[in-house]
A protein has these predicted regions:
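Gly/Ala-rich beta-loop-alpha elbow adjacent to hydrolase catalytic centers
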Residues: 79-83, 87
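C-terminal catalytic histidine-bearing segment of alpha/beta-hydrolase fold enzymes
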Residues: 149-192
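Short beta-strand/loop motif that positions the catalytic acidic residue
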Residues: 124-126, 157
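Serine-hydrolase catalytic machinery in alpha/beta-hydrolase-like enzymes
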Residues: 1-72, 164-165
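A conserved short beta-strand
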Residues: 96-106, 121
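Short beta-strand immediately N-terminal to the catalytic nucleophile in serine-hydrolase-like folds
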Residues: 77-79, 103
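Short, proline-enriched alpha-helix->beta-strand connector loops that line the catalytic pocket
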Residues: 116-122, 148-151
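Conserved alpha/beta-hydrolase "acid-adjacent" motif
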Residues: 131-140
């Protein structure tokens, strides 16, 4: 089974993120969920983003890198929204990455290096009308990634919600989250 390093979104390590990790764990995968916010959890995306901005987004990425140091190299990196930054950065730069799943966000590949690494499959998931994912360049970055990487998939879901896969937030979309979970489990099974 796969070993996964899962990074939470800007609201923190919510009950919904923990639930997603538990679902992967129940399927036999080993899942690590570092708390990059030191216990802080926010009810709104804006409050979480404000916290991340005060700490600095680079701090968030560095905490993610530090969380990976004591773990084996052969990880699948999963990130939700802001958590995509450390997940994508590690998938692109840490030797031995087995795969990546990027949810609600995607940075340009050039942000972390010249090209997506050979042999590292990636999935990107987002809502087609999410003003952050679709309106701030993430969707364009995801399309460019899929167009340049050998094993990359982009899954667009109907709707306009950000953090749609977290059942502990009001933005939760049960149907889209269920489909995302099925696709991620199939992806992880393919890697084992």
């Amino acid at each position: 089974m796969a070993e996964v390093l899962l990074f939470h979104h800007a609201c923190g390590l919510t009950a919904g993120v923990r639930e997603f990790a538990a679902t992967l764990g129940a399927a036999g995968h080993t899942v690590h969920t570092p708390d990059l916010y030191d216990g802080h959890v926010f009810d709104t995306l804006q409050d979480g983003v404000t916290y991340a901005e005060k700490a600095g987004f680079g701090t968030f990425v560095e905490r993610g890198r530090a969380a990976a140091l004591d773990l084996p190299a052969g990880l699948v990196y999963v990130g939700f929204s802001l958590g995509v930054l450390p997940a994508q950065g590690l998938a692109q730069t840490r030797e031995g990455a087995r795969g990546a799943v990027l949810v609600d966000a995607c940075a340009p590949v050039a942000e972390f290096g010249g090209a997506w690494p050979q042999g590292v499959p990636v999935q990107v998931h987002g809502m087609e009308a999410d003003e952050i994912f679709a309106g701030e360049g993430d969707l364009d970055a995801a399309r460019a990634l899929v167009g340049s990487a050998a094993d990359a998939e982009l899954f667009l879901y109907p709707g306009d919600r950000h953090n749609f896969a977290d059942p502990s937030l009001p933005s939760y979309d049960r149907a889209a989250a269920g489909l995302l979970t099925e696709r991620v489990l199939a992806f992880l099974d393919r890697l084992t």
